[in-house]
Amino acid sequence: MPELLRLEHFGFTYPQQPCPALADVSLTVRQGEFWVLCGASGCGKTTLLRQLKPALRPHGAAEGRILFDGQPLDDLPPHRQAADIGFVLQSPEEQTVTDKVWHELAFGLESLGCDTPSIRRRVAEMASFFGIQDWFHKKVDELSGGQKQLLALASVMVLQPRLLILDEPTSQLDP
């Protein structure tokens, strides 16, 4: 399988902190692989994951390299970063950008410039796949925490990213 993501001796230190949050992290993720990152609360899992989506990176000093598809991640145009790297945050409230469920599903595709027929088809497929048709026309603020988490996941999956990052994706799902 081709290499998709590589970290080489990556480290990160938050501003005004004496110790690094991450030190000498090296790993390779190949297309089609499924990885699980486990560790105690506060050990740096979210800090590491946010390094993989430049728009979500915290401020601080980084060292080492992150390569996506063989090139430095920071050299990828923003359009490719948005399309190829999907990220579902721990808290869906931090991810929601529109007021209606259907528009939340369509927003990313609209932002990437997809044509209307493709948007409608892909949104309908995701709504069906996740079983959210019954609340498709609801306002996002009327949803439960679990429904919001499911919507956040569906909103990223509709983009069909090459790399999908889930930061505690089931933390608020309804039983």
Where are these regions (language model features)?
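Conserved ABC ATPase signature
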Residues: 139-143, 147
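Conserved ABC transporter NBD signature motif
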Residues: 61-72
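Conserved catalytic motifs of ABC-family nucleotide-binding domains
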Residues: 160
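A short, flexible loop at the N-terminus of ABC-type nucleotide-binding domains that lies
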Residues: 1-7, 12-24, 56-59, 75-77
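Conserved ABC ATPase "signature" region
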Residues: 117-135
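The feature captures the beta-strand-to-loop junction immediately N-terminal to the Walker
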Residues: 38-40
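Catalytic Walker B motif of ABC-type/P-loop ATPase nucleotide-binding domains
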Residues: 164-167
